[in-house]
Amino acid sequence: MDAQHLMTMSGISLEQVAIMGCSLGTGLLVSMIIYNYFFHPLARVPGPCTGAIFPFWSMSSLYRRRLNPDLAELHKKYGQILSLLSGYGGLLMCPRNTGPIVRVGPNQLSFATVEAQKMIYNAKPTHTGSDELFGRDGTLQDVLLSMILGAANIGSLSNRAEHKKMRKRLQPGFTSKALFEQESLLRMHMDRLLQGLAQDTGVIDLTEYFSRFLWDLIGDLSFGEPLVPEKHGRRTDTLRSLVGVYQGCFPILEAINYAVPQIEGVLKLALQLVPPATLRAVLPSATFREYDHPAINSHTTPLQCCINRQDGRSDFLTHIMGDKSSNPTELELSYDELHSNATVLMIAGYKTTETSLSALFYRLLSTPGVLEKLQTELFSNFQSIDEITGKKLLSLPYLNGCVNESLRLTPAVAGKFASRRSPGAIIEGFYVPSGTEVYTETYTMQRSPQYWHAPDEYRPERWFERGEGSPYAQDVHEAFKPFSSGPRACLGREMALQTLRLTAALLVYRFHLKIVNEDRFVWEQDTDSRMIYSKYHIKAIVQERLT
């Protein structure tokens, strides 16, 4: 007896079943909206209505690729009214220029204060047995990162103890001693960049030059040799397959993460069930394994050559592997784990540094008077370009001010993608229930008038003119967190800063630079902003100085 016959016997038609189903679905939807907007534990936190009932606000912002400016505007909007802070003891009303807390999703809060930054990212583990006070477990972005890379790495490990162990293994590659040892490698790639710029004529796209330079440099440091020479024509395609897949899924992930909270567990289980060989064949990161070593045979990858190498060279990967000559058992990571870590260092180091370098030269060339002051500082300290070293550049206040100020205005990674899960804690006077996704919005905090004088203006002198009577005396430098903070802060911070300082110093010392901006490009208006920036270009006329 089929279902239709049963319904006929009971006097219920298919049309009535459909109507009842639609009514039930509508009722559940209305109930969810009413609960999220009026009765949810986060209902008293200010924020857009479209964010309270469903993650429509985040989905829209990510789809339109305007995440950083949209979040800044959101915090500003809710800072113009009396920002509502709720704690155990009742309600506290306080006026601020920038709303300290905004509800951007049904179960998601964005903060923009130093206090929240410390609480979320620097808090020590609790005595309750959880991994950490604010953990990464349960964030769908981390699961997706694991899927893309296919093995445990410094970026995807959510367990605090395991992450600490991995970070300790990688840390020797990023110490001051390691940076000094790696400077010759940096200068080798830098010389190629300078030579290419010197030979080019007309209007030059600096961003494209920076992209090639950093791809070769970071690939050399991560895999033991530059990946994908330009003649292969596959450098851009490779990165797009890795980063594009990740970013393109963001709007959908926002909906899935809310509608199916258990999706992370399902994906983690799937990763365990799928054979590693199958994952390697289908994941975008598999393309890194296809590159041939030019000196050996077509079946030997750069990573394997680096593992086999005995020349004592210092790079990221040799520190990951440890000193095999003195302790053969030190190589505790599998090939897949080595590859996964090298890949994540490659992706993170390349794209973020390229963004920061392009943003730095955009500020240098488009802000009146800045380039001239930097030139004066460099020529007064160095008689020739050969005298310029990373160590000497540390003592130049204006150069370091230029770098820091660019990072303040343009942090490479959006704060949303360093989100954590609350274990149930009070942040900014508001009790944040367990499981709530929280993060500090770096872009907003680093442009907040609460912490900075003239927050939207590029003023390198704010970093060294801080004496009595200075307009920058009250600037709060604790609000400067372009590399995040705490145990998961960017491992390559010092390497990135050294690359930015050296590139700026060498280019400004050797060349006359003049921006060409016929299309009136403005960084804040014309770049795409999601997890990272995209669609930016810095065009300039570059002429070698007469010596």
From Swiss-Prot:
Catalytic reactions on record: sesterfisherol + 3 reduced [NADPH--hemoprotein reductase] + 3 O2 = sesterfisherate + 3 oxidized [NADPH--hemoprotein reductase] + 4 H2O + 4 H(+)
InterPro entries associated with the record: Cyt_P450, Cyt_P450_CS, Cyt_P450_E_grp-I, Cyt_P450_sf, Cytochrome_P450_monoxygenase
Role this protein plays: Cytochrome P450 monooxygenase; part of the gene cluster that mediates the biosynthesis of sesterfisheric acid. The bifunctional terpene synthase NfSS converts DMAPP and IPP, and also GGPP, into sesterfisherol. The C-terminal prenyltransferase (PT) domain of NfSS catalyzes formation of GFPP, whereas the N-terminal terpene cyclase (TC) domain catalyzes the cyclization of GFPP to sesterfisherol. The cytochrome P450 monooxygenase NfP450 then catalyzes oxidative modifications of sesterfisherol into sesterfisheric acid.
Source organism (scientific name): Neosartorya fischeri (strain ATCC 1020 / DSM 3700 / CBS 544.65 / FGSC A1164 / JCM 1740 / NRRL 181 / WB 181) (Aspergillus fischerianus)
Major location category of this protein: membrane
Protein name: Sesterfisheric acid synthase
Names of required cofactors: heme
Chain sites annotated for binding heme: 490
GO terms of biological process kind: small molecule biosynthetic process; terpenoid biosynthetic process
GO cellular component, one term: membrane
Family: Belongs to the cytochrome P450 family.
Stretches that traverse the bilayer: 19-39
Subcellular location per the Swiss-Prot or TrEMBL entry: Membrane
Highest taxon listed in the record's lineage: Eukaryota
Pathway noted in the entry: Secondary metabolite biosynthesis; terpenoid biosynthesis
Molecular function, one GO term: monooxygenase activity
Membrane topology of this protein: Single-pass membrane protein
Glycosylation sites: 341, 404
Keyword Nucleotide-binding among UniProt keywords: no
Keywords: Glycoprotein, Heme, Iron, Membrane, Metal-binding, Monooxygenase, Oxidoreductase, Transmembrane, Transmembrane helix
CDD domains according to UniProt: CYP60B-like
Broad EC category: oxidoreductase
Catalytic activity, EC: 1.-.-.-
